[in-house]
């Protein structure tokens, strides 16, 4: 379904279909696509369409690859228009994960993507001798942009363990190909460490890792660093609309900085922390929305002007005393409103406190789920925690915690966990509800985290699950 939404959003004119999609049969999928996406004028099918397809209705627009090739290679190249190419031309449409709605098509240029690769290459000191294990999907900016562009710049090898994430296959590839680096989102590292073959896998060749894509509690980063082990673990922050990363740790940063911040801005990026609704810059060290401008910034959400204007905004205050000023040509700078809440410390490190839309308001108090998740994961029995707002008649919202127990551990009581949270946090930040993965015999609570296509834990799915639990 997510793939269909992406196709609808792009409104393509030609679609090339392989002999079969993963898990699906083309004879069933293509008629659905043809019906839902009227913009498609021609299907080019890499298969024997006469044998397998009834070419009636929507599929009458189909042609085999061989026929399409013979029809179009006969054209005289001299008659084709000569189109100049600019570094700022769109080269890739990358889709956001779509966890909160229809995936948005992000238009990125040669300039965006290759500068991202150059940043990663310089920061990690990658060389042509490196072998990168990349279990992150290529439809995600982490895989497509960070993985491919940085390896292209460095000349390093890429190992793609499996067509979808598989912890066992990833560990096999690390040992088989003597990988020197491993990339992933937090849930991937957690799943790899929990895999039964982890302790038996030779991981001695790994020199560094890159972790990004979701909240990263300090306790989790400490576990990953020591378990693999990873001499250099680079934590990063970014988003698809910024050509992936805008901040990254440096290997000379202290362990405390590497486990509690998302690093500093890359060169040629500028950022502010502002009030979400007004765009007014907040005092240094105070929380607000992180807005970014720079050479990784997308040009638009393709064919979505309204969404583009909502995300990329001008700030008149830039021209006021103390503002960042105009661009070299005198025009106002466009800022990408990221939706992430955070602040800069006195040394310029970015500290993420959560997603603005994930904030829970309990009795008038704004509560960041990430703060409580970080505390819960410090408990010796908990591998991973997710905090969700639960509708409540008295307080508006209460706190609910979904938890994953560490293998071989005894499950603590709800009261013990509340006391544990209150040792470091305010009393009202202790969750009222606790749910453990796989704890319901009726199957209402799954044994594994619901995830987006890019491997992140899906909080919208957890919110929907709460409705059936209360």
Language model region names:
Residues 3-8, 13-19, 182, 294, ...:
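AMP-binding/adenylate-forming catalytic core of the ANL superfamily
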Residues 17, 21-87, 468:
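ANL superfamily adenylate-forming
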Residues 46, 426-456:
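AMP-binding/adenylate-forming catalytic domain of the ANL superfamily
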Residues 60, 66-69, 179-184, 193-258, ...:
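Gly/Ser/Thr-rich phosphate-binding loop
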Residues 84, 91-115:
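Conserved AMP-binding A3 loop
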Residues 114-131, 139-181, 191, 195-196:
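Conserved AMP-binding/adenylation subdomain of ANL enzymes
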Residues 264-268, 280-323, 365-367:
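Conserved ATP/PPi-binding loop(s) of AMP-dependent carboxylate-activating enzymes
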Residues 272-291, 322-328, 346-347, 410-414, ...:
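Conserved beta-loop-beta connector loops within the AMP-binding
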């Amino acid at each position: 379904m997510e793939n269909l939404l992406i196709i609808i959003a792009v409104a393509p004119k030609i679609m090339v279909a392989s002999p079969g999609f993963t898990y699906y049969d083309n004879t069933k999928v293509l008629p659905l696509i043809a019906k839902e996406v009227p913009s498609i004028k021609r299907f080019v099918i890499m298969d024997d369409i006469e044998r397998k397809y009834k070419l009636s209705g929507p599929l009458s627009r189909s042609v085999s690859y061989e026929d399409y090739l013979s029809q179009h290679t006969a054209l005289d190249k001299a008659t084709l228009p000569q189109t100049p190419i600019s570094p700022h031309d769109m080269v890739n449409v990358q889709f956001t994960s779509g966890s909160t709605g229809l995936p948005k098509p992000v238009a990125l240029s040669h300039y965006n993507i290759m500068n991202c690769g150059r940043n990663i290459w310089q920061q990690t000191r990658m060389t042509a001798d490196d072998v990168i294990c990349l279990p992150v999907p290529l439809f995600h900016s982490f895989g497509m942009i960070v993985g491919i562009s940085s390896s292209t710049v460095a000349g390093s090898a890429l190992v793609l363990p499996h067509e979808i994430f598989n912890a066992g296959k990833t560990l096999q590839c690390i040992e088989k190909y003597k990988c020197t680096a491993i990339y992933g989102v937090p849930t991937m590292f957690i799943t790899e460490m929990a895999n039964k073959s982890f302790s038996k896998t030779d991981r001695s060749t790994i020199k560094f890792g890159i972790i990004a894509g979701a909240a990263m509690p300090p306790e989790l980063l400490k576990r990953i660093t020591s378990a693999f082990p990873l001499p250099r673990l680079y934590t990063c922050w970014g988003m698809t609309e910024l050509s992936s990363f805008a901040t990254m740790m440096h290997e000379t940063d202290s362990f405390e900085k590497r486990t509690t911040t998302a690093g500093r801005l890359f060169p040629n990026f500028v950022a502010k922390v502002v009030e979400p609704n007004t765009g007014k810059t907040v005092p240094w060290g105070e929380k607000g929305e992180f807005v970014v401008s720079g050479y990784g910034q997308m040009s638009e959400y393709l064919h979505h002007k309204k969404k583009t204007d909502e995300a990329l905004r001008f700030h008149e205050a830039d021209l006021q005393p103390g503002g960042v000023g105009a661009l070299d040509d005198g025009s106002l700078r466009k800022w990408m409103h990221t939706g992430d809440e955070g602040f800069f410390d006195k040394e310029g490190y970015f500290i993420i406190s959560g997603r603005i839309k994930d904030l829970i308001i309990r009795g008038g108090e704004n509560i960041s789920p990430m703060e409580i998740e970080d505390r819960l994961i410090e408990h010796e029995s908990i591998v991973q925690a997710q905090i969700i707002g639960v509708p409540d008649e008295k307080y508006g919202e209460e706190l609910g915690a979904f938890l994953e127990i560490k293998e071989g551990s005894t499950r603590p009581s709800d009261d013990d966990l509340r006391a544990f949270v209150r040792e470091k946090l305010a009393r009202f930040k202790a969750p009222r509800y606790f749910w453990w993965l796989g704890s319901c015999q009726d199957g209402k609570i799954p044994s594994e985290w619901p995830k987006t296509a890019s491997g992140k834990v899906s909080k919208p799915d957890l919110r929907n699950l709460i409705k059936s639990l209360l």
